[in-house]
């Protein structure tokens, strides 16, 4: 194997630069990146647009239900007379926020558990893996529903807090993270196990390095690639979870919009105003498919075979 | 003067769960069994044996990666599990492609032992890395590069530079040449020799290649199935091997243009370390085996007339 | 192997037991109170009567004790009474299970067939146009929210084309097989489409790997026609492991069924659990959830055992 870059001798051909080049070649992934950027702009425009139009996204107007698109309401109104476009934008903020934060929380938990199990090995590993396997084996949606139905006041929270929007948001983040960390844990554990035996880890140990040093200096940097790929794909999965839960009434509860709960009563208006049934789901679909393509592109870019 | 590293009846036993339908009883794998030897300052001790002999496990124990199940190790006459011992004993591996963290640039790789031991400031470490990189024969600009940009031989040089960084007294080299192309092997071998001469380093040189051992070693230790069967100065060992196993090993080395001295064919295969033969571990394959060999474990004792050469055989020559 | 089976089965029971406690506790955290629900709208109830009622139903006891009583009753076959259906829980579970089984089996079979067709077609020319198109379809399949897919299908087939009914189970006059099929069509289609994506990927990967193997090259050299090779040889080899993986996806399938049943007002396990939770029917919710857990765990166990049987490396652990 010879040095690859004979041209720029003093330039470090770092791993990340190689990856970016490979990623750029993956056209669907690049397109997805653009699509996601567009979606982010779309949801970010909610506040400014509301101010511009002078509208309150939560204001109901039962005299103007199911209105067609007009100058006042660019996409018409929904079943309670609220502006559909604004609700889509704010709903997007909620859905994306839950997606990202739940992924971060669940991912961190999974990372910690995977590292502990993979590096410590032995009894700790066995215990953690039994628990993980137990959770993986459960039917997810019924479990999420039961968790979502929990009455916070019975856990000691005040009634006011229990019914607030913040509680609803954090509840769904916690539930999803609680149930979704297993995929990350398994992945990280496998990576940690394979890293543990590598010679460079042994060399560090021979020089007197302790477990914490090894985990942070060697194992973590080497597992970032599978983590990033898995994390990206998790976001898609989490967005789908949130949408189902909100749709069934156990996630984000109205009046706060989320793409899922906007389809709450969709069966009622699928005949009167099909657009309302199409838009929120379409946005979920586009977001998730873009995220999945992005993850796929990242996976190809991080192909470890060319980086031995 | 106490030796640099002393091993006293050191054993490494692993418990293995049995196979079978209901899981058999636990068995003990004796990778290393009651080995005693010493490595002096500035000497190269070669550790020779076939795969399964336990030489790698022994090397791991000397490098501090594994604690012995029985027996003890001493560093300069004192305790072994100290920070100073870790600094003084460094390791070079067989597989250059696994020995370097692909995410770290060469400068960090070489300086890592210094970071772990807390030696020097960042600037000092960088300077030292630059010095070492040139001493192992690599260009200065290697410092900013990543392992995947280098060949096997070059990576091994980097690994050697890393081992030299904390100014060690002993380097445990576990088959450092085996994975390299033949033409590169001699380069690295010469590098190791010149480094030793400059710095008065000791080597524990683990190898199955007797040709290389002949080139580099001061003393040779021969392992079979975890037991030390012969320990002798290099010249004596090659001229007059005392233990039948050593004799067989030497006879197996092809020599161009010279007829074989004697035919000592070994019968059978190496037994499993899970079920070592009773008495002398070698008796199942030994052409000289007698009843006593099965009954009594031979101790390491000097060969007739050559007090420096120790062999564990009832019929040593 | 026997040890493996026993160990996995024991694990499954342990998880089920733990989950029964967890779910029992969670049900207790649901909004509302069994007593309040019972006395709802009854103005003549005094606090003394409420306390008395609590005593009778054992609701003043601590959680572990209540759980224990429930467990003992459940093991004896008594799962309690369903408040919303005015029937013993067991009598409600039976028909619901049958309905869900109908839906899931049909949906799963359709998915499998579609997946094998699409996956094989995609594997014939990896990287080609057909493969790319199918790839797009699979990505769409794993990215689409099931409930929205159901809505779209309803929009297309029921509202616009009027070919199929939008919901419900059978006509008022219980019009025989054709009517039942018409009502089953959209839910099955929804479920199938949602899962075909993942299954197709498995089949494609397995087929690509199988087609690369030497025995396929031999078959070609023998002069067999391509369709014969693909279907007779490659597909048959890829069949068992792939189907095993598909069986493992039972959990996801069940979640999809839950949503589909709710959307199409089909009275299966999913809708039963959902309604029970919304209606504070604690006994039914608890039993339904546990049953769903049991079935998922059992199918995972079956798949694990099949895997272990197929792959001799695993079964010897």
Regions found by a protein language model. Name each.
Chain B
Residues 63:
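Helix-to-loop junction immediately C-terminal to a conserved catalytic motif
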Residues 124-141, 194, 250-251:
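Conserved ABC ATPase "signature" region
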Residues 146-150, 154:
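Conserved ABC ATPase signature
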Residues 71-81, 85:
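Conserved ABC transporter NBD signature motif
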Residues 165-169:
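A short, proline-enriched helix->beta-strand linker immediately N-terminal to the Walker B motif
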Residues 172, 176-261:
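P-loop NTP-binding/switch modules centered on Walker-like glycine-rich loops
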Residues 3, 16-23, 28, 231-317:
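Short catalytic/signature loops enriched in Gly
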């Amino acid at each position: 194997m010879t040095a690859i870059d004979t041209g720029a001798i003093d330039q470090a051909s770092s791993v990340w630069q190689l990856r970016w080049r490979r990623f750029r070649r993956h056209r669907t992934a690049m397109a997805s990146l653009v699509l996601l950027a567009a979606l982010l702009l779309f949801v970010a425009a909610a506040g400014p647009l509301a101010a511009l139009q002078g509208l309150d996204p939560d204001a109901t107007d039962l005299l103007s239900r199911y209105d067609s698109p007009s100058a006042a309401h660019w996409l018409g109104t929904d079943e309670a007379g609220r502006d559909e476009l604004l609700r889509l934008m704010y709903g997007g903020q909620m859905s994306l926020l839950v997606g990202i934060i739940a992924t971060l929380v669940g991912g961190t938990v999974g990372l910690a558990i995977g590292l502990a199990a993979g590096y410590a090995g032995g009894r700790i590993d066995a215990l953690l893996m039994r628990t993980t396997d137990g959770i993986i084996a459960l039917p997810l949606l019924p479990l999420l529903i039961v968790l979502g139905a929990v009455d916070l006041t019975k856990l000691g929270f005040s009634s006011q807090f229990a019914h607030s929007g913040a509680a609803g948001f954090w509840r769904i983040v916690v539930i999803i993270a609680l149930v979704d960390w297993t995929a990350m844990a398994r992945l990280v554990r496998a990576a940690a196990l394979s890293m543990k035996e590598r010679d460079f880890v042994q060399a560090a140990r021979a020089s007197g390095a302790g477990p914490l040093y090894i985990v942070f200096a060697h194992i973590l940097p080497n597992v970032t690639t599978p983590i990033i790929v898995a994390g990206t794909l998790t976001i898609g999965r989490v967005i789908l979870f949130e949408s189902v839960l909100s749709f069934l009434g156990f996630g984000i509860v109205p009046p706060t919009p989320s793409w899922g709960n906007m389809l709450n009563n969709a069966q009622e208006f699928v005949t009167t105003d099909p657009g309302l049934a199409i838009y929120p789901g379409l946005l979920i679909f586009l977001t998730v498919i873009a995220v999945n393509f992005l993850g796929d592109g990242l996976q190809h870019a991080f192909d470890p075979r060319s980086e031995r | 003067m106490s030796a640099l590293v002393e091993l006293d009846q050191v054993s490494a036993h692993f418990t293995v769960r049995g196979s079978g339908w209901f899981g058999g009883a636990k068995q003990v794998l004796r990778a290393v069994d009651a080995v005693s030897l010493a490595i002096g300052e500035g000497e190269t001790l070669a550790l020779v044996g076939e795969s399964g002999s336990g030489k790698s496990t022994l090397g791991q124990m000397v490098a501090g990666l594994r604690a012995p199940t029985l027996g003890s190790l001493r560093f300069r006459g004192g305790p072994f599990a100290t920070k100073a011992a870790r600094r003084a004993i460094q390791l070079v591996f067989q597989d250059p492609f696994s020995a370097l963290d692909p995410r770290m640039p060469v400068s960090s790789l070489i300086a890592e032992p210094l970071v772990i031991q807390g030696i020097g400031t960042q600037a000092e470490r960088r300077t030292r890395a630059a010095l070492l990189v040139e001493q192992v024969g690599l260009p200065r600009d290697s410092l900013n590069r990543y392992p995947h940009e280098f060949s096997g031989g070059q990576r091994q040089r980097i690994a050697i530079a890393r081992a030299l960084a904390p100014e060690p007294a002993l380097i445990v080299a576990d088959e450092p040449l085996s994975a390299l192309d033949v033409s590169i092997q001699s380069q690295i071998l010469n590098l190791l020799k010149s480094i030793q001469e400059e710095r008065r380093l000791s080597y524990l040189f683990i190898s199955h290649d007797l040709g290389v051992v002949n080139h580099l070693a001061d003393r040779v230790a021969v392992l079979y199935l975890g037991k030390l069967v012969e320990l002798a100065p290099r010249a004596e060992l090659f001229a007059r091997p005392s233990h039948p196993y050593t004799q067989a090993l030497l006879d197996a080395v092809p020599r161009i243009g010279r007829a074989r001295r004697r035919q000592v064919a070994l019968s059978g295969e190496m037994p499993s370390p899970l079920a070592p033969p009773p008495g002398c571990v070698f008796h199942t394959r030994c052409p000289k085996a007698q009843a006593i060999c099965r009954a009594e474990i031979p101790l390491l004792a000097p060969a007739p007339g050559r007090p420096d050469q120790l062999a564990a055989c009832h019929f040593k020559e | 192997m026997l040890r493996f089976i026993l160990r996995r089965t024991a694990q499954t029971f342990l998880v089920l037991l733990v989950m029964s406690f967890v779910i029992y506790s969670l049900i207790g955290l649901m909004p509302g109170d069994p007593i309040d629900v019972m006395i709802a709208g009854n103005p003549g109830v005094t606090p003394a009567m409420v306390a008395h009622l609590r005593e009778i139903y054992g609701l003043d006891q601590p959680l572990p004790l209540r759980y224990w009583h429930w467990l003992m009753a459940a093991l004896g076959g008594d799962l309690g009474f369903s408040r919303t259906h005015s029937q013993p829980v067991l009598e409600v579970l039976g028909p619901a299970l049958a309905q869900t089984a109908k839906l899931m089996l049909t949906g799963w079979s359709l998915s499998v067939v579609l997946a094998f067709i699409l996956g094989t077609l995609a594997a014939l020319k990896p990287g080609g146009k057909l493969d790319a198109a199918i790839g797009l379809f699979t990505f769409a399949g794993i990215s689409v929210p099931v409930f929205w897919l159901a809505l779209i299908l309803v929009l297309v087939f029921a509202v616009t084309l009027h070919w199929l009914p939008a919901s419900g189970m059978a006509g008022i006059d219980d019009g025989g097989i054709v009517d039942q099929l018409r009502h089953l069509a959209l839910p099955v289609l929804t479920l199938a489409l949602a899962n075909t994506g993942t299954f197709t990927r498995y089949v494609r990967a397995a087929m690509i790997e199988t087609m690369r193997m030497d025995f396929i090259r031999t078959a070609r050299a023998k002069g067999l026609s391509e369709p014969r090779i693909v279907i007779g040889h490659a597909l048959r080899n890829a069949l068992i492991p792939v189907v095993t993986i598909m069986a493992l996806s039972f959990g996801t399938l069940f979640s999809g069924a839950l949503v589909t049943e709710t959307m199409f007002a089909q009275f299966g396990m999913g809708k039963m659990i959902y309604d029970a939770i919304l209606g504070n029917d604690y006994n039914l919710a608890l039993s339904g959830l546990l049953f769903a857990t049991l079935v998922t765990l059992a199918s995972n166990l079956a798949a694990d055992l099949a895997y272990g049987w197929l792959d001799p490396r695993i079964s010897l652990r």
